[in-house]
Amino acid sequence: MPKKKTGPRKKAENRREREKQLRASRSTVDLAKHPCNASMECDKCQRRQKNRAFCYFCNSVQKLPICAQCGKTKCMMKSSDCVIKHAGVYSTGLAMVGAICDFCEAWVCHGRKCLSTHACACPLTDAECVECERGVWDHGGRIFSCSFCHNFLCEDDQFEHQASCQVLEAETFKCVSCNRLGQHSCLRCKACFCDEHTRSKVFKQEKGKQPPCPKCGHETQETKDLSMSTRSLKFGRQTGGEEGDGASGYDAYWKNLSSDEYADTGYHDDEEEDEAEDEEEEEDGKDSDAESSDLFTSLNLGRTYASGYAHYEEQEN
């Protein structure tokens, strides 16, 4: 029989469980609500952007910097572990800051805990948009996380990416390793796996969570809970239209190709006919101009300036 747990042992186990849950809840904080990714409006140019030490657009320093770790704008003397001791009861502005994070480009206050823990726990350490491959230093907007594949996204690509994220890189919902129906889907690899092939020796399944992807280790989701769609690639004989009985094959494919070729030759024939008509119209126009000039040459208008006659010649005669 197992040993009976004593009071101190129960308290220690409960404390360890609470600490574990606290660490897990801290790691699952919404990225949009994190202080280093908070929304900030510049005091000088009035442009909204991600919380950062210097404005992305005008490089000006904010009057009230926000700490990237604890999110405070005022450092109190009594209730904080200040590395830099300040004389007053509290400090704000540049007197409160202690460092700039290299990952999120935001101020960190001069508290000992924030300075020692933020660089290791910064959620924007590898924050590079999966679509445009821009980091925090390459654009001024905030960083978001895809709700399906949990990759980083910038403000410009977040809606477009999430609208097309649930698309498999296959034409069926079958498992990539066998021919059975894939009950679990990895939204990073865009592939489905059956129950047997989700068991991996490399990535272990945690208690109370979905099995990890055998390729990348990301947590899979059940396909029935997602609005997954397959990618349709039409090439070769698949581009041919279906026949009356619903079948399509190479006959329809070659018929379409031949009809396209005939359509192209007909198009070129029409162009040649139009050019010939234009040339005929130009020739007809030249003939009509010559005929009209012949008619006017037979007319006698007498002595005019156009015929080389001037009025002073008549006076001399």
From Swiss-Prot:
Top-level division of the source organism's lineage: Eukaryota
GO MF entries: zinc ion binding
Keyword check for Flavoprotein: no
Motif Nuclear localization signal location, chain numbering: 3-11
Location of the protein in the cell: Nucleus; Nucleus, Nucleolus; Chromosome, Centromere
Keywords noted in UniProt: Centromere, Chromosome, Metal-binding, Nucleus, Phosphoprotein, Repeat, Zinc, Zinc-finger
Modified residues (Phosphoserine): S288
One Pfam family cited in the UniProt record for this chain: NOA36
Positions of the UniProt region annotated as Disordered: 1-24, 206-299
Biased composition (Acidic residues): 269-292
Zinc finger (C4-type): 42-58, 67-104, 129-149, 175-189
Range of residues in the leader sequence: none
GO cellular component: a single term: nucleolus
Statement: the UniProt record of this protein carries the keyword Nuclease: no
Biased composition (Basic and acidic residues): 10-22, 216-225
Family: Belongs to the NOA36 family.
Full protein name: Zinc finger protein 330
Organism classification: Eukaryota, Metazoa, Chordata, Craniata, Vertebrata
